[in-house]
Structures are given as C-alpha cells and as structure tokens.
Regions:
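A short helix-loop-beta-strand connector motif used in the catalytic cores of GNAT acetyltransferases and
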Residues: 4-6, 37
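Conserved HGGG/HGGXW glycine-rich cap/lid loop of the alpha/beta-hydrolase fold
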Residues: 20-67
Length: 176
C-alpha cells in the first residue's frame, strides 16, 4: 500500500528526516506524537491523497528512521519547527497546511507562530494551544500538578530510560 519509493530523506543541517511523500496538490504536512511514527497517519494519508492533496509525513526527530541526536537541546521547539520548515523547503512550497497530533500538536502550533507566512492552516489534536506567560514546561506542571503527564516525566534526564528499560515488555504494554 505504501510504496518504498515514496520515502525521502530530507536534510535539516545534520539531521536526516525520513519522510513519506505522496499525492499532488496543496501540501499538507502531518506531525505525529509520542510514541508514534509516520505510519500513524496512514488512513489520513490515503484520504488526503485521494482528495487532491500532496502529503509529507515525517518520522519526527528521534523516531523511526529519522536522526536521533543525543543532546537534549537538539529537541527544543525551535529545532523541531525547523524540521517542518526544512520539509516544506524541500517540497519547494511557500505555504502549506500543518496537522499535529499529541506531541506533534505543539510543534504545529509553534511552527505556525514562528512562520505565519508559511503555514496557511494549522490543526492541533489532543494537545490544545495554550497562551501562557510561563515557559511551556512550567505551564504543564501548573496545569497537571500531581497528575502523571508524560511530557513532564520525560524532562527528568536518565530516569525515564532507566525505568522503561527495566522491563521492556511491561513498558510497551503500559504505553500502548
């Protein structure tokens, strides 16, 4: 169903972004969340292509066949939004629509904020757009307080890796 020839590695500086590209028409870029991959969008890809759109669907930075930098700062929102812009640049389009799900939603919101001349439509699912004077992680801590929220959990360097790697089977069952 999804032809291997439709995958392209798109460069953003030293990052290689594995991207599924298909269709003809206005460009729609779709950013997945955690713990997902480009394949999470398979049903939307089929429908969008069938209805006259071109899609570019990456494995986001750190996932799948896309580069996985070890430095934490390589995953800051400016770097993630630059990956989206690199995809649009490679597609040679000035304007595109952007859909983000879960962790892809903040990437979509921020790409549209930092590049309003490029993003003509934006949709974020599962994570709403929040205006706050606090840094995003502080806003999340305030909103979720003592409730488990994975985005806060993942801020603790080393702890997550240790806990998830203890029992991979149990971790995968808990996640999915």
């Amino acid at each position: 169903m999804f032809n291997q020839k439709n995958f392209k590695i798109i460069k953003n500086k030293d990052i290689e972004i594995n991207t599924y590209i298909d269709g003809e028409g206005p460009l729609v870029i779709m950013a997945h969340g955690w713990p997902e991959s480009w394949y999470s969008w398979r049903h939307q890809i089929t429908s969008l292509v069938k209805n006259g759109f071109k899609v570019a669907v990456p494995d986001m930075r750190g996932y799948g066949k896309t580069s996985k930098p070890t430095e934490i700062d390589a995953y800051n929102i400016m770097e993630l939004t630059s990956d989206i812009i690199a995809i649009a640049d490679e597609m040679k389009v000035d304007n595109f629509s952007l859909i983000g799900h879960d962790w892809g939603a903040p990437v979509a919101w921020n790409t549209s904020l930092y590049h309003p001349d490029r993003v003509n439509k934006v949709c974020g699912m599962s994570v709403p757009y929040v205006v706050s004077k606090m840094p995003p992680i502080e806003t999340m801590k305030f909103l979720f307080k003592d409730v488990f929220f994975y985005m806060i959990y993942f801020q603790e360097e080393g702890r997550v890796e240790k806990e998830l790697e203890q029992d991979m089977r149990k971790s995968l069952i808990a996640v999915y």
